[in-house]
């Protein structure tokens, strides 16, 4: 018997798998990677040796204002480590520069004051100037061009009306943008809902290039790079993290060159070969990424990449915030026929995209090919409304999976475990 401690919210759940049924365990090399220095030193070294760019302190000279785009509460970016160093570097080059920290909420809810304190520490949260991006406020946006896909590129004016635009973030596999970080700080981070909807259209989500670990030929990535370049994002500081959300590498400098270097590092660690199985058990990496069902679809796609068609995906995710998107939830709840719901989404043109359509589309893709069981703190009715199976604990989920397979004539189905679904690129 093999035992696994799987991240679940701010704690863990225990999975036991018989030796003769275990097909494989897919784990990112980042989890065992031994960094060359402590977290702060890694970030310091990256800022001192930027890739394809002068130092940030040099860029700050002669500038009156600077906006730093920073990830929101749903992302495990160690801002308490990165942000003080960005502020110090900027003020070393220009003590009088006026700095605004713009929270890149994308299409998420707004970050609370308590969440800002938890993320940055009390000193920064209470003394620096913060602006919360709201993608639905048209009056906050300014048009800066047309995306390669044809959509209007509207970005928060706080990011545009500044002398120097900087971003912090982290690099991990992303289920349709290829990887997070870099250009994503602008789109979707601080872009208008109109621009996000155009970029996240069903046509692009349906592309074989809009998948985890793929940047080349990815239409979503192409739009994002355009938005970041056109917004004049001058400097980024991105980190890679391990399972404990600790920094293991840092990359600073030009938005594309630094990001590409970080992606190459991450890919070496995150790329794992598929181990096809009847049952795949995964998570969304625990808090903060498993706060809702919406975010948990990311981890499910890692399971999808190694689950046999018609198999069972078990997702262990706290979902303490519930579904995470009203439109996302309602699309699934109101779907009497899953294929009809998918066809309706695919029929929408780029300018007809609705809120959270992309997440609905990906979850529908999963549900049309697999049975999905959620081990979660979310209400059972919510899970069942969304056409998934609810299990109160992982043992019940495993028994349920065996029953689903037995009804298909499969006994003692094989099991692959992906302890952190958002950290791997399954190939």
Regions found by a protein language model. Give the residues of each.
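Glycine-rich phosphate/diphosphate-binding loops that line cofactor/substrate pockets in enzymes
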Residues: 51-67, 91-97, 271-279, 306-308, ...
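Short glycine-rich or small-residue beta-strand-to-loop segments that form or flank ligand, phosphate
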Residues: 65-76, 100-106, 281-283, 314
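Histidine-anchored nucleotide/phosphate-binding helix
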Residues: 75-96, 101, 296-306
């Amino acid at each position: 018997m093999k035992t696994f401690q799987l991240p679940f919210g701010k704690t863990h759940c225990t999975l036991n798998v018989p030796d003769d049924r275990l097909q494989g365990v897919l784990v990112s090399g980042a989890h065992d990677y031994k960094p060359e220095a402590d977290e702060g030193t890694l970030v310091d070294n990256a800022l001192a040796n930027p890739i394809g760019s002068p130092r940030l302190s040099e860029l700050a000279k002669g500038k009156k204002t600077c906006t730093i785009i920073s990830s929101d509460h749903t992302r495990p970016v160690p801002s308490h480590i990165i942000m003080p160093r960005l502020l110090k570097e900027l003020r070393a080059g220009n003590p009088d520069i006026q700095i605004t920290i713009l929270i890149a909420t994308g299409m998420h809810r707004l970050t609370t004051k308590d969440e800002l304190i938890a993320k940055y520490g009390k000193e920064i949260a209470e003394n620096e100037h913060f602006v919360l991006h709201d993608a639905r406020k048209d009056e906050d946006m300014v048009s800066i061009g047309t995306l390669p896909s044809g959509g209007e590129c509207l970005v928060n004016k706080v990011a545009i009306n500044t002398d120097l635009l900087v971003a912090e973030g982290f690099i991990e596999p992303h289920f349709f943008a290829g990887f997070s970080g870099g250009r994503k700080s602008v789109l979707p981070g601080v872009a208008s809902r109109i621009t996000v909807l155009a970029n996240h259209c069903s046509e692009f989500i349906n592309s074989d290039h809009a998948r985890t670990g793929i940047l080349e030929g990815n239409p979503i990535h192409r739009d994002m790079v355009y938005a970041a370049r056109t917004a004049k994002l001058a400097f980024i500081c991105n980190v890679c993290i391990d399972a404990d959300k600790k920094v293991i590498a840092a990359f600073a400098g030009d938005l594309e060159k630094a990001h590409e270097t970080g992606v190459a590092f991450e890919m070496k660690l995150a790329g794992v070969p598929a181990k096809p199985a009847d049952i795949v058990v995964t998570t969304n990496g625990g808090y903060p990424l498993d706060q809702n069902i919406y975010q948990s679809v990311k981890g499910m796609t890692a399971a999808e990449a190694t689950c046999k068609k018609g198999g069972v995906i078990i997702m262990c995710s706290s979902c303490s915030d519930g579904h995470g998107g009203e439109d996302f939830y309602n699309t699934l709840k109101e779907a009497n026929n899953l294929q009809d719901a998918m066809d309706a989404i695919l029929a929408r043109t780029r300018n007809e995209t609705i809120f959270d359509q992309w997440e609905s589309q990906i979850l529908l893709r999963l549900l049309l090919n697999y049975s999905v069981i959620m081990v979660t703190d979310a209400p059972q009715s919510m899970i069942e409304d969304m056409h998934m199976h609810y299990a109160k604990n992982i043992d019940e989920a495993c028994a349920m999976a065996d029953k689903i397979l037995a009804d298909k004539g499969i006994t003692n189905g094989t099991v692959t475990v992906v302890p952190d679904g958002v950290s791997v690129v399954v190939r």
